[in-house]
């Protein structure tokens, strides 16, 4: 039986003979041959292992080859629809860029630019000068530097200012910032020496003072943006640490994480420390992310006293961690939105989604509900109240009131419907609970409505 099946396997030349010549030219004959060899070899191996009891026909091998090459040509990084209600969704790319920032990236990608060219002097310039001015204007810092992410920013600052020196940190601030990336490990890699003070839930100013030695290089304060310690707690403010640091002539470094530039508590969100407040407290060097609460591209932004920033700029690691022209283009425009707070709230998608009026979200839900009425033979739709989250390791206590579209079906259960939506040509990521699939309208964009309709229609008609 096995020998008969192996003999029945079609030859490569025979399969090639039934391909359209245009397909061979478009994909390349060698590529098609290679894919066919893999397909036939897989079938041969399965026959020998007695996993299958059939040999592929020429037509079946051709179909598999076409499908495989089509999949190979698809983008791995693709558009998805975020129906989860998590605004800064780490796994879905974090913050979206504004229309203007997106256009700036496209322009930088499609044309030459003055990335490192001083147009006034007609000579080589610095890429950092393109963005340092706007960061200084918005934050009030003496100087600024941008690297490729906030973990890199922390590591670079510590290596530049505290190599082989002790850095004093509260035990309650030894955070893990995601992907098992922990402050102690970052510090170790930077060659700074960690000195832990206080306890997980309670640290006093005298703990910092008692830990000072001749080897002390800095105090480090880390904002616990992705968790909260409640109950019997005590922490020391940046202002208190800065007062002590001035007495002892020791620099203070603060990682405030998410990069909040405006007080969002006035919009009903949880109060988070802003970059400006940190600098006003007297912190010498502040680091934060560009693609979280700030709403821009992935970057680590370092601001603070010029004497410290200048030293950081001279570190050889700075070149290894530098940002490209796309990041600079996106970040510059995003930051310019902040020159007018109203413009920032309206134009930066992250801020706009977080501050959306509940009435507007309900209108979105009603609109989607009406769009989907034609699919009532496949599904039952309803609108429910729910909660969104900020995401991105930011504001863990903030629950944002929202409206959800609930999808029920008699023909497909919620697990399979979620999978079908996730595997659609434009993946739709949803929530599943209470025996149904839910779409949170807070994170649905204008172009998403039609895709959601088409996806549900195609799934229903299967």
Curated annotation (Swiss-Prot):
GO terms for molecular function: L-seryl-tRNA(Sec) selenium transferase activity. InterPro entries: PyrdxlP-dep_Trfase, PyrdxlP-dep_Trfase_major, SelA-like, SelA_trans. Pfam families: SelA. One of its GO terms (cellular component) is cytoplasm. Keywords: Cytoplasm, Protein biosynthesis, Pyridoxal phosphate, Selenium, Transferase. Its cofactor is pyridoxal 5'-phosphate. Its EC number is 2.9.1.1. It is found in: Cytoplasm. GO terms for biological process: conversion of seryl-tRNAsec to selenocys-tRNAsec; selenocysteine incorporation. Pathway: Aminoacyl-tRNA biosynthesis; selenocysteinyl-tRNA(Sec) biosynthesis; selenocysteinyl-tRNA(Sec) from L-seryl-tRNA(Sec) (bacterial route): step 1/1. It comes from the Bacteria. The modification N6-(pyridoxal phosphate)lysine is found at residue 292. It catalyses: L-seryl-tRNA(Sec) + selenophosphate + H(+) = L-selenocysteinyl-tRNA(Sec) + phosphate. Its main location: cytoplasm. Gene3D superfamilies: 3.90.1150.180, Type I PLP-dependent aspartate aminotransferase-like (Major domain). PANTHER family: L-SERYL-TRNA(SEC) SELENIUM TRANSFERASE. Belongs to the SelA family. Converts seryl-tRNA(Sec) to selenocysteinyl-tRNA(Sec) required for selenoprotein biosynthesis. This is L-seryl-tRNA(Sec) selenium transferase.
